[in-house]
Amino acid sequence: GVVELSMNNGPVNTLTSDALFGLRDCIEQLSNDQTVRAIVLSSPFKVLSAGLNIKEARTFDSAQQDAIVRGLNEGFLALYACPKPVICAINGTAIAGGLFFVLTADHRISTPTAKFGLAEVRVGVDFPMGPLEIAKATLSKNDARRLMLRGKSVDAETAKNMGIVDLIVAADDVLPQ
């Protein structure tokens, strides 16, 4: 059937290396489960994911930095390569690393009030290679350049025009879709 993976690291679903390695392991397990036909990514919060906790990331030692980069690479590449259809139910903001949940999905359904962006340039954080390759593969060169270099978010309608979002529906209809 359809499996819903609900991110539950509220209030903004910040990314941690443990969560990203857990995502990788979960996706690999679901990929090999013959009873799973599709995977839905969702969040019970007003934010799909805001990416890393930058204040916390600035205090990482080299081992923690290596772990988060490996987690970002392995977690998002597993999601991107998943052989099952992945649907992202976007009920709110997907910024920085959080946008990669959207970009790795095969079908992306959003509320009209959702915001999307890559804010790394605003806080001086580099893109790990895996997410960078996903952005290059899923966004036009101009859209990737604009999102990465400006660091500003776009609304759902603009995201739809950019191909980030496939469908915009009322908030109550995001998961049922």
Language model region names:
Residues 10-13, 46, 132, 145:
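Glycine-centered loop/turn positions within well-structured domains
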Residues 1-44, 77:
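Conserved CoA-thioester-binding segment of acyl-CoA-metabolizing enzymes
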Residues 8, 43-44, 50, 91, ...:
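A secondary-structure boundary/capping signal
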Residues 26-29, 71-83, 89:
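Catalytic-core regions built around general acid/base machinery
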Residues 5, 22-23, 41, 53, ...:
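Terminal peptide-recognition signature
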Residues 21, 35, 42-77, 94, ...:
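Glycine- (often His-adjacent) and acidic-residue-rich active-site loop
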Residues 80-177:
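Crotonase-fold acyl-CoA enzyme core
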